[in-house]
């Protein structure tokens, strides 16, 4: 049986899903893409206005209805609460860092005063304003080509995108600066894909399990536990970044931050823990943020 892989129709989404299709074929399972239009692809309002899960719910509905066998999501877009209807697999993560695409090859520090920078993500807005309060931050939606086209056309001086997305579509050379997590921290699970099938589809569960990457899975779980514990959605100004000890992978370091949208304040905490117990580490760092007053920064975005 040929597996139908549900995916959004953008260039990035189909490239991501195509990678999963090719991996399944490598392991002997024939697969093809099944394009699904989601409300988030039609409504160009800022994501925080449309609602959490806008990109994932339509795919999950199609999957649950049996119209496809597999759904491919960007893991950072998934609601943090587990859905027992589905089996989740997380393949190897791409580079999780944030990237700037600016005119004339400029870096963030080199952008002129009052430069226009496009992004709609509160997490990016708040961190950009903390570094460069003079910048004019403008809302930005659309696919990668549309976003970068606003720089090419001169409408914007720069845009902020996930470096993973640029890399997946072969446009990483367009980045004029890539930020380490201690400069601009990425979203929880940024760069990771979430692959779902119906939990009772045992044959497809077995096929997808061959794609699981344990280090990516536990890192994403730790990061998303922070989001869940803070009761914050994927559009909240919350960032997290987990790393595993390069030698043994036994020790995980998790850093997470909560930011005031105007860039005036931030809370950032780190802790080390057992890499095999990512939820506990996520709970620990989240509690540090809560005790320090994270709710005051999140406000009604929690």
Swiss-Prot record:
What pathway is this protein a component of? Answer: Porphyrin-containing compound metabolism; protoporphyrin-IX biosynthesis; coproporphyrinogen-III from 5-aminolevulinate: step 2/4
Gene Ontology BP term (one): protoporphyrinogen IX biosynthetic process
Under catalytic activity, the entry for this protein gives: 4 porphobilinogen + H2O = hydroxymethylbilane + 4 NH4(+)
Cystine pairings recorded for this chain: none
Q: What does the note under cofactor report?
A: Binds 1 dipyrromethane group covalently.
At the top level, the lineage of the source is Bacteria
- Entry-linked HAMAP family: Porphobil_deam
Record-stated family: Belongs to the HMBS family.
**Mind telling me what this protein is named?**
Porphobilinogen deaminase
Tell me which species this is from: Corynebacterium glutamicum (strain R)
List the taxonomic lineage: Bacteria, Bacillati, Actinomycetota, Actinomycetes, Mycobacteriales
- Per the record, the gene is hemC
